[in-house]
Amino acid sequence: MSETFVLQQITGLLDRGHDVQIFAEKAGLQGHLFAENDQYNLLNRTHYLPPSPLPRWRRWAQTAWLLARLTPTCRSSSLRLAAAYYRNRRCVTPRQFLACIDILAGSFDIVHAHFGPNGLRVLPLMQTDVRSGFVTTFHGYDVTTYVNRYGRAVYEALFTSGDAFTYNSQATAEKLVKLHCPVERMVKVAMGVKLDRQSFRERRLEPGETVNLLSVGRLVEMKGHEYAIRAVSQVKERFSNIRYSIVGSGKEAGNLQALIDELRAGEYIELLGAVSNSQLQDLYRHAHILVHPSVTASNGNMEGQGVVLVEAQAAGLVVLATRHSAFPETVIEGETALLAPERDVNALADNVIRLIEQADRWPAMGRRARRHVEENYDVDKLNDRLVEIYQNVLATKGS
């Protein structure tokens, strides 16, 4: 629920008249999501897993209560569910088994798990005789660090039992194919943006105006903020009228602030921390260039599609990013963005300088970026595609 792109799928399905129930690991609707919650009453649609660890007697009591709610047919399925849980107990906790019983009681047409590990958590349900269709969406870390940690066969049973597997980019698709995901059940559904909520503005640089650079992303190694900070400090030697704002929170905050202090860059580079959605939209409106310097982390973690790149292009920003994961697919190099190799501070700095020196190109780059998003990342079109996938899964299950 903390991922905006998941929320946009949920609200899009509700807008189309479908009933959606949400099963979440823990409470925590972030503040910037409450505006959606007011309209859609999402909290009343959300079921949270019981707190962990529960005493054994509480688990038995809750299991008995959930089983009592089941219809006789579902009770029969629950026996198969228990057997499936036992087979998959290495990747499904007792709490998640209780959630599976709750899902079983709901008699849902479709069970859609976002991120591969969540697909594994409902795997016991897939291995019963329930008629629900099972869809799993892969995003990024689930085909990189998760696989590195648990092995290349971690999704073997999921690939056997699932009905459809969606992915956000060709880069993610290639990783899934290497893991032996059945190609005939793979479908691309990119993560989009609501264009009516992402206001567009052509970017222009007036004489003497400060160049506003913006980064949006968690303060973790994978986001590569260190390299952008070093690059901007180099650019400052050439252009004095520059400011760089970094949105996000994370465990690298202290190290990044120490780097800013070391470079004596505090007057023009600022860590803003986490911001609300309305504050983020305001930052998009006033920025000229989005800097997104992601890298492959030391543990192998990589981004997937790069949703921030989509948001920025929709707003008309010029983009500077790295050749990381699916980024060359999400932007159009040379037309909507400039790309640099990962961890290459000099290349990042050169690209910032190039963009500033070619500021007359910004309006055309912004218009092309908006059109690119309208054609490929309009969440309304993507949600229509998602409904088609659901319908195809159900048609196949019924045949």
Which residues does each predicted region cover?
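N-terminal subdomain of nucleotide-sugar transferases
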Residues: 1-51, 106-108, 160, 398
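Donor nucleotide-sugar binding/catalytic pocket of nucleotide-sugar-dependent glycosyltransferases
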Residues: 24, 133-139, 151-200, 208
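Conserved donor-binding/catalytic core segment of Leloir-type glycosyltransferases
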Residues: 166, 197, 202-223, 229-232, ...
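Nucleotide-activated donor-binding/catalytic signature segment of Leloir-type glycosyltransferases, i.e.
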Residues: 257-278
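Short alpha-helical donor nucleotide-sugar binding micro-motif in glycosyltransferases
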Residues: 274-275, 282-287
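Acidic donor-binding loop of glycosyltransferase active sites
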Residues: 285-300, 317
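Short hydrophobic beta-strand element within catalytic cores of glycosyltransferases
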Residues: 309, 314, 318-321, 331
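Conserved acidic donor-binding segment of nucleotide-sugar-dependent glycosyltransferases
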Residues: 333-334, 338-345, 354-359
